């Protein structure tokens, strides 16, 4: 069964459930998780393919399962970073290493599950190493990522912990930055997941 993406799938940050950590996915994958996977892919790929307006959806480059009502540990990302297509659907991801140095997207971050705009620098690790079961490769993989892809992986991983990007903005000085922090300036037409 294929799904036509709709914004009615989205769960917003005013829903208490999305602010709680998600549960691990059990293997073998059941029908409910397969449905979740198909919906996540349909939603983000519609954005990637430039069809967000056609489907009347909020465009995004990534989405976590709890953003569409599945309280499980998986997310999907599909974006271009430095003119390279990046695509992964990670199940039960774990961050196994990260830099001490920080980074932020110069333009800030957005989120499919956040209606209110939150201005400021979202401070994250400059690079991360994450592992998880990749749906497309059908095996556990390890990814070391920087740049937009690295920021997006951290953004989606935060969702699985019940955390939102705006919780990483300095509440006293939203534009605070240190000179050694890396500024990431992607050319991007859509928001984060």
Swiss-Prot record:
Cofactor requirement: Fe(2+)
Note describing how the cofactor binds: Binds 1 Fe(2+) ion.
Chain residues that bind Fe cation: 111, 155, 159
Listed transmembrane segments: none
The keyword Metal-binding appears for this protein: yes
Classification via CDD domains: Pep_deformylase
EC nos: 3.5.1.88
UniProt record, GO biological process: co-translational protein modification; translation
GO molecular-function terms, A-Z: metal ion binding; peptide deformylase activity
Positions of the catalytic residues: 156
Pfam families hit by this protein: Pep_deformylase
Keywords: Hydrolase, Iron, Metal-binding, Protein biosynthesis
UniProt keyword Protease present: no
InterPro entries: Peptide_deformylase, Peptide_deformylase_sf
Gene3D superfamilies in alphabetical order: Peptide deformylase (3.90.45.10)
Catalysed reactions, semicolon-separated: N-terminal N-formyl-L-methionyl-[peptide] + H2O = N-terminal L-methionyl-[peptide] + formate
Result of knocking out the encoding gene: Probably essential, it was not disrupted in a global transposon mutagenesis study.
Family, similarity comment: Belongs to the polypeptide deformylase family.
Described purpose of this protein according to its UniProt entry: Removes the formyl group from the N-terminal Met of newly synthesized proteins. Requires at least a dipeptide for an efficient rate of reaction. N-terminal L-methionine is a prerequisite for activity but the enzyme has broad specificity at other positions.
Protein name from the UniProt record: Peptide deformylase
């Amino acid at each position: 069964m294929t799904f036509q993406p709709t914004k009615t799938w989205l769960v917003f940050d005013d829903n208490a459930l999305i602010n709680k950590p998600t549960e691990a996915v059990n293997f073998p994958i059941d029908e409910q998780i397969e449905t979740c996977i198909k919906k996540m892919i349909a939603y983000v790929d519609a954005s990637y393919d430039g069809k967000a307006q056609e489907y009347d959806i909020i465009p995004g480059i990534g989405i976590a399962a709890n953003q569409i009502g599945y309280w499980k540990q998986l997310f999907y990302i599909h974006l271009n970073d430095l003119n390279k297509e990046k695509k992964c659907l990670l199940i039960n991801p774990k961050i196994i290493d990260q830099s001490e140095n920080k980074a932020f997207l110069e333009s800030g971050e957005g989120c499919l599950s956040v209606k209110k705009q939150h201005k400021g620098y979202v401070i994250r690790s400059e690079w991360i190493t994450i592992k998880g079961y990749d749906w497309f490769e059908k095996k556990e993989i390890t990814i070391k990522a920087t740049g937009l892809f690295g920021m997006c992986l951290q953004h989606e991983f935060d969702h699985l912990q019940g955390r939102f990007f705006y919780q990483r903005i300095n509440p006293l000085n939203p534009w605070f930055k240190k000179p050694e922090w890396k500024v990431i300036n992607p050319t991007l037409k859509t928001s984060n997941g």
